[in-house]
Amino acid sequence: IEVPIPFVEESLGNQNLLRILPAFLNVINSGGMLLIDEFSSGFHNELESLMVRYFMEKADRAQMLFVSHSTNLLSNSILRPDQEYSVEFQNGNGSTVRRFSSEQPRSAQNIEKMYVSGVFGGLPEYKEVSDEAE
């Protein structure tokens, strides 16, 4: 049985994909710059990797700048450290942008683990919820 699903009932990942796919394909085919905030919001890890790899293989005269909270893309096999940046917010005093290659990671190092351990900055700081706050 084929029943169309209304857009609003699609998953967040499917909605996000359907929103960005036209611009994504247009930039690949026509060239230009694609800016995407929350690129992989709702995507399966395999889909976000596939899209980045596809863009890098097919886009001749195009660039993509995207923001993602997913660490899945911090793989040596997907992006190089000179293509990865972190943004660290300075408690109301602006932000600091750091290129991962500034730490000169070796090709055998696990970039995702380095990021999660705080080497590149950009990690959010969460305070413990105390009993007094309740």
Q: Where do the model's predicted regions map?
A:
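Conserved active-site beta-strand-loop modules that form the wall/rim of enzyme catalytic pockets
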Residues: 16-17, 32, 63
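C-terminal lobe/lid and adjacent interdomain/linker elements of RecA-like ASCE P-loop ATPase modules
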Residues: 50-134
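Conserved ABC ATPase signature
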Residues: 1-25, 39-43
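Short basic/glycine-enriched coil/helix segment immediately N-terminal to the Walker B
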Residues: 24-32
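Catalytic Walker B motif of ABC-type/P-loop ATPase nucleotide-binding domains
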Residues: 34-37
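Polyanion-binding interface signature
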Residues: 1, 30, 62
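Short alpha-helix of the ABC ATPase nucleotide-binding domain corresponding to the H-loop/switch region
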Residues: 44-49
